[in-house]
Amino acid sequence: MATALPRTLGELQLYRILQKANLLSYFDAFIQQGGDDVQQLCEAGEEEFLEIMALVGMASKPLHVRRLQKALRDWVTNPGLFNQPLTSLPVSSIPIYKLPEGSPTWLGISCNSYERSSSAREPHLKVPKCAATTCVQSLGQGKSEVGSLALQSVSESRLWQGHHTTESEHSLSPADLGSPASPKESSEALDAAAALSVAECVERMAPTLPKSDLNEVKELLKNNKKLAKMIGHIFEMSDEDPHKEEEIRKYSAIYGRFDSKRKDGKHLTLHELTVNEAAAQLCVKDNALLTRRDELFALARQVSREVTYKYTYRTTRLKCGERDELSPKRIKMEDGFPDFQESVPTLFQQARAKSEELAGLSSQAEKGMAKQMELLCAQAGYERLQQERRLMAGLYRQSSGEQSPDGGLPSDGSDGQGERPLNLRIPSVQNRQPHHFVVDGELSRLYSNEVKSHSSESLGILKDYPHSAFTLEKKVIKTEPEDSR
């Protein structure tokens, strides 16, 4: 996976350290977690350092951690090894990606800027002398060789390279960086493009701000002597006074104010610089915000959120040659939650579709169970029917044996009726009918209603047999006329 190029000086320092430790594969992980402050890595305690290592995925590789620790120690003791003696430079405030590739300038500074005198009024920032070939050629043979930092072309290696030409270092003032006017006590400020974005956002927000009553402000200052002593003179200055803006910037700063207990050498980040600039611009529009720092801080953060994203996206697209393109993402809104409201119908439709799918699956399962029960019942009924048929066949054979002429009926001579005529023998045959009806009643009680349709045929055979026998006998028997004696 290709490693992204550093875009700020803080990222460049991290890039050089990881390059020294041969750990460039972790560069993207550090940037994604916001680890572009090398000083934070150096000052972190044991627990904090291990937590950072876990965030970037290095905790499971102790040898990589040791290599990084060694590179950090080398960076602290001998930063010259990394070509980065940038101890007094704002780490995250100067974007590098504004430079087009192959440009002989660095952050809008021409090669001649490095030859300026070091006796300027403003505090100076030291920059490394990593020379580009175009800069060296433009200077001439008689001048001292001085370099500037430049990107290599895309076809070559993506590494940041440069070479030292002399041991001396030239100075660079904030004015050379294109930063707007700022108090002389501070060397940290936004560049002109970011400050312009802040001013535009404040101009859009100014009409929506509530108007402050000057009498209320004066009453507040009268009751608060300490606050009046600090900022009371600002309200007495006229708008044409050139020192009024400087005083407003001095007392409106949210981060790194002159009376704060910030550690020496701890530089402001890009977010903090943006918030300070927004607070200053807001206080210039409405001086009364100096007395309401809570409200000022909230408004400045709102401006910073909008400006930071838009400015970062704009400068990134400028590097790719796509200018004046609007941001494709939606800026976070303070008033409502439209994204949540739009997602509710979608979630409802998804839940409804899932419920319909579950209902369909449950109906299929019920149908399958019903079919299985039907098959089991059919099998049980078939087995019961077979048993009934076997039983009926046995009863039928038994009844047939009793009615057979060979030995099924008892002889008439045994009853002493051998001399009687045939018509007198009929009652003896009819006396046997209740026996068959008793058998029929017992069979009907043996079986359930489920198999009546199947057993009716067998029972019908058993019922009809004796009646048919009686009918045949009646046809054969001829009654004799009584003797007329």
Swiss-Prot record:
This is NGFI-A-binding protein 1. PANTHER family: NGFI-A BINDING PROTEIN, NGFI-A-BINDING PROTEIN 1. One of its GO terms (biological process) is regulation of epidermis development. Residues 391-422 are annotated as: Necessary for nuclear localization. Residues 4-82 are annotated as: NCD1. It comes from the Eukaryota. Pfam families: Nab1 (PF04902), NCD2 (PF04905), SAM_NCD1 (PF04904). The modification Phosphoserine is found at S171, S182, S327, S404.
